[in-house]
Amino acid sequence: MNEATEAWPKFKVLFATDGDSAEIITDILTGTDTNAFIYSVLHNCYIYPTEVKIVLILCLPAKKPGGGDKCLEVFQLHIDTELAIPFLFYTKPLKANDLHKYIDFKAARKNFKPILDIISTNKPSPKTHNSDIKSKIVWFRAKFVNSLRKLYKISSSPYWMITTFGSFEVPFLLTAIFYFFEQHNCTINTIFHLSSLFEKKLGTSLIAITTFEELGGVCSTSDYLKTAPAFINYCHIKLARDSLESQAIDTSIDTLRGQLMLSNQDLVHYIYLSFFQCLNKDIFIKYSHLTNSDNIHFVPETEVLAQSLDENFRKDMLTYYNKSTYLKTYITHKCIHLPDLIGYAPQDCTSFVYWAGQSKNVHNLLNVINTTHPHINISEDLNGLLDLAAIDSTFNVDNLKDCVFNESQKVPVYRCEFLNKTYFVIVQNDILKNVWSTDVLMPMQENWYMLKDTEITSNISYKETFTSMLTLRDQLKISRHEYFNPRLPVFNLVLDLDLHIHTSEHEIDEIYNLCCTLRSLILETLQLLGPVDIDTHHVYFFKSTCEKPENWIDNKELKFCYCTKKLGFRIITPLPAGVVLLGSNPVISFVNILNRTIKIDKKLLAMYPLIMETDGPFDVGIYHKGRCVRIPHTYKVNSSGRLERLLKLFVCHPHVDNKLQYVMDSFDINNLLYHSHNPEKVKQLKAVYDIADTNENFILQKAQAQLPQTNHNAVERIESASHMSITDWVAEFAWPRLFELIKLYLSEEKVSQFYHVSFAASTGNIIKIISLSGNFSCLNFKHRLKTQSVRIFLSLHLTPDNCVTLTLMSQCFASKCNSNKCIAHMSVRVPITDK
């Protein structure tokens, strides 16, 4: 292309042909005679050019444009203006046979050589000059034509363009011009919306257009073609403004998000709510009016949409997702003061007195008690055993446990695995304190209790056992689980921690830092219930032991912990003095609050980011009736009887120099059970029966409140609007219409079973159809074995315009019908109050 040609104005033309465009393009390139015509459908020459010659770039829509050009060049025509004007503005087509006079074949080679290089790879081809593409196209014509179909969106009908860009002249013209001829990253819907803001008039309808020639005639002669430059300018201004507003919203959201510790779910809800506040329907309509073509130049320079973010919502987010303000602002509890609340009887550890049995033995024991004490009437299962364990002689003259123990007192219930059998155990007097004093060796150093916490932990030695004992009595000394008993007050908070991790080697200092952080969080949360001395209050940590890695070498120094997926701890701490929890609900609520406190602690999240992917590290399921948890210093028994995961003491009492009392208390069974009675006698105990997070799930509830509200109860809506029962309404209004469809689409054999039916309301929006002349047969198949298990019913669905869509459904239990899978057959739409 010489310098003179470079100076000619260039215009893009979206063209069509009166035949197969791929074949016609190939004919033109190969010089094959053709009678085809080329039509201008759309172009970006908005006024008559004044130059003598111009360059027309003939284009076709890209089949898969992605983020690239929406139309791709096919030919460049160097053509006289007097020939181009009728083609562009007066629907006069160009003959395909004449195009070779105007085509820039150098540009054509540049366009099509990459295609030819690909399809001719490793294929024999004519030995011609590299610049001669005509011979290659002739040689590989079929593949070349197929490649054009994959590259360009080729269609003989303009229907796809009309349905895509609009069925009226003005929005179609403006939307299509900007979409095809301008550089942008917009969806068609966005451009269509911009066209409606630019021009309210719609122009003529395009519904009746059937050919590209007709469509090109409308676009080329449209009076609105000359407004395209103004529309393009408006689009660029509007999109720049939208980008400014969007960036301001993102900045506002990200600024607040950076201050909050949000789970993935909460983050999604927060972003949704924030965008909803800025871009809900009302605000979007106002903003669209503010930025239409008449007002766009008068919009304030400052951002508009970001100002819609609700300050109260921001305040709620900042306080709810901040640890200190969360605990002070949103946590409440209800309590009463009760005298003489007691838990388990203190264990003097002088003798081992217990009863043990399997489920059948539990049943027999409780049956005997119900027989001898009929007024007690307890269930003869585990729940009954828990009820029995919670009864003492305070309010009963009789000793209900007289067939087991000499005296009646409140006792713990344990579970023990022995010889692949589960035993339920009630213990009146325990000896675990004595057992642990012999099986656990304190550090050998003089004044060991003055050492650092980690040094004491490293020097405490357990006499470990790896296989189950020979007797149940001995097995109870090394493995048992305490059942949570909701009939007894809770004196000690027992926590089961499963902390998900992504590393496999942990030094003792890392674990200690974790324990110190958890201790601080637990005590800070406990202060909600009563006064706690942060320095001296005992919080016991028992870490589940982990095995050495399989590839460990003997001469390699061992790390303290090799846990891979999660760290397991049992954490136990007494409640504040004079405070008890009643039942499982306040315990569950408290632990849920503790979980949330952990999830918004930045220090802990920095150490263990996987916390955000769960509901929290503390298991709340262990506090339900019938659930149990392994007590400290004991083993888990696996299916083969092997003992594993011993819960060893991990000392964490950082603010007291002398750890003796702390360590000794951690081996006292009276300090380690849910319902162990506090030895300090308090006349009036503060009994907490309800703990609540007043703003729990507020972000989820707020998000749900913004979703479109629909009335899902169709039956209730129908009955209230029609003043009829649902069965009468179906029989009078809906069934006659549906029955006409049934007669139209089902065979007479199937239809006959619907002549005599009645209706019955079922659950949800389901109406059962009951045959009065026998059972229904399958509506899909004629089974060889006539099944009597066919269910026919109607499903009701409300529509926004006060109508109901009734769908005839069936279920057949035959295997050929996918064994009871629901099948929809036909639907009819019925107004609620109009026949």
Swiss-Prot record:
Subcellular location field: Host nucleus
GO molecular function: DNA-directed RNA polymerase activity; zinc ion binding
Pfam families from the UniProt entry: Herpes_UL52 (PF03121)
Keywords in alphabetical order: DNA replication, Host nucleus, Metal-binding, Transferase, Zinc, Zinc-finger
The keyword Metal-binding appears for this protein: yes
Residue ranges of coiled coil: none
Site residues (Essential for primase activity), renumbered to this chain: 496, 498
InterPro entries: HSV_PRIM
Zinc recorded as keyword: yes
GO biological process, one term: DNA replication
Cellular component, GO annotation: host cell nucleus
Zinc finger (CHC2-type) stretch: 778-817
Enzyme Commission number(s) from the entry: 2.7.7.-
UniProt family annotation: Belongs to the herpesviridae DNA primase family.
HAMAP family for the chain: HSV_PRIM (MF_04011)
Function summary: Essential component of the helicase/primase complex. Unwinds the DNA at the replication forks and generates single-stranded DNA for both leading and lagging strand synthesis. The primase initiates primer synthesis and thereby produces large amount of short RNA primers on the lagging strand that the polymerase elongates using dNTPs.
Subunit composition and interactions: Associates with the helicase and the primase-associated factor to form the helicase-primase factor.
Protein name per Swiss-Prot or TrEMBL: DNA primase
Species this protein is from: Saimiriine herpesvirus 2 (strain 11)
